[in-house]
Amino acid sequence: MPEANGYYRLENSFHQAPPGAKKLGPADPNEVLPVTITVRRRPGSPSLPDQEHWASTPPGERQFLSSDEFEERYGADPGDLELVASFVRERGLTLVDTNPSQRTVVASGTVANLSKAFSVELGRYETDDIVEKPRRPIRVAEKAPGKQKKQGEAEKTVYVGFEGYVHIPERLANVVEGVFGLDRRRLARRAMVPFPTITPLTPPQVAKLYDFPATPPHMHKETIGLLEFSNPMFGTCGYYPGDVTSFFTTPLGIGPGYTAPGLTDIGVNGASNAPGGPDDIEVALDIQVAGAAAQGAHINVYFTTWDENGWILAVKRAVHPKPGERRPSVLSISWAWSEFDTIGGLTWTKAVMDAVSTTFQEAAMFGITVFAASGDYGSSAGIPGATAHVAYPESDPWVTSVGGTTIGNVSGSSFTEVTWVASGVEFGTTGGGVSDAFHLPFWQHHHNIPPSVNPGHHRGRGVPDIAGYASGYTIVYSGAQVPDVQGTSEAAPLYAGLIALINGHLGERVGYLNPTLYSHRLQHCFRDIADGRNNSDLGAPGYTSVPGWDACTGLGSVKGHALLKALEHHLLAVHAGHGEESFTGKVAGLVFDRFGEFEGFLLAEVHGGERKFDSREKEVQQVVGRAWSEHVTTTVTVRDKEAREPVSITLRDHS
């Protein structure tokens, strides 16, 4: 129903001030803000493929879309875009862009005009950021405006925002899904801390210990996307190209003998590559780790702002690039923010979370694998107190969450690996726990995800999914070495590099990864970490590292070559007999159900005279033994339509 002014309340747009925030007064009516308006898909569009679809369609058999195909099937109706554009112009706002694939209308306007257009009261709010500053590595990059705070002292942040709902006129009520940019509070914190007591390894050394596959030919076809964030009010972040060159080609980094990646800078929401701020170290770390793990791959660096509009526009830009831009095959995100400030106090509005999550779902349709660091604040996600939290976007089921480990006692290919846990305000702890925003996905049902440690002990998506080295790299920044840079943001770009390598070997994109990772047939691909450590942090109750999946290291660290082999189209010998008839051939792939149990053949090419045998000619009658995995023989019984009796087929790995 419309409200008194004839406007409709936009559901899921509710904002509340952060705990302890103080409203300083109205926002400057002449300040210009960017906004993004998202619209519905064109009427009659099919539903996006869901997780069950991708679980039943294994890598190698997935059909991805072109930009034109996606726009035609799932894009916005041009009439809807024009309707919103007309509203923008009528209200004295400036129309910046419309994009049918992203389903967005981007505009800008003064605070006065925006307040009237969307029936909100924009104000200036002051809030504390009490955990970022102590965990920030104080390096040569520290040039933040204003007086520097002491360790442990609260840092005041002022932002433009509002409380309550966004409102839209009646004619847009069934067209507009969200309006973003009217609230500019912070929604991104980098996952990176100093830890000066560990002798760091290099990214190539870690890749070797994790048995990453060799660099295949044609890696120039692979593109890794990195999302980087800065303060929309005054902050900047970026990298110096000379630092990247030095890291790969000189003893300051891992050189000589390595090649610096090709880089493309893509600015979003007014941000750009502008080094000189406190977050430069994160940008340098992401580029140098991803580039070292996947030599020859191109890297897109997406610079954006750390508010809701910056998140939405950056993720949409990566998934739906402009003409001439490379679409990444892998996306790595080393930034996050707690789902909730307190229980019931949603930090991300549902509209923002839905918009970002839907775009990650769209990424699967282009074969994009998305990784996100689980954060460096243990079970607290950076929120002090007696309540556990997890961060977003790592809690999104369309994202592979990456926790942290520590590697020691290295001797050749042998090493010890434990949960990355430390104590004290200057150190870090691998993030992980149970989501408050997302239900337990079906692909985690058989992995003993514990209930939340919070009162009520609800069930939800467990994070992280996997874990990797977080115990310190030496990187190059501003022409000098910066040692001991640690955090789960080391692990996310490392695994982005691994998937780029695997894509290069396969000659096709792996795409959405989570249901595949949790398949029983892939469990030999992980190094389980069960050291009994707990990720409690900042007063929040924690979770313990135990055998199997846990909320510290997920399934464990990844054995790169084993994962490649598991994702390949396995060349399997097939031996079958029925009466006097026998034949031998190859199976290109196997079908597993959502719980990892063998269901049948994806494709089979069987040789023996002129005999052909494929998945359409038989149906599985019985499964004998467990699902196929490396070094395991599985016998299944199938029925040939031409045979009166079942045919027994034994599969053995001969790859």
Q: Over which residues does each language-model region extend?
A:
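Substrate-binding/charge-relay-adjacent region of secreted/lumenal peptidase catalytic domains
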Residues: 2-98, 106, 111-402, 435-487, ...
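Polar, glycine-rich mid-to-C-terminal structural blocks
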Residues: 397, 401-436
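An often Trp-containing, charged/polar helix-loop segment at the C-terminal end
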Residues: 406, 451-454, 502-551
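A recurrent domain-boundary module in secreted/ectodomain proteins
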Residues: 549-572
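Structural detector for short beta-strands of small beta-barrel domains
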Residues: 577-597
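OB-fold (S1/OB) nucleic-acid-binding surfaces
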Residues: 595-615
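Short nucleic-acid-contacting surface segments enriched for D/E, G, S/T with interspersed K/R
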Residues: 619-635
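OB-fold/S1-family single-stranded nucleic acid-binding modules
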Residues: 640-655
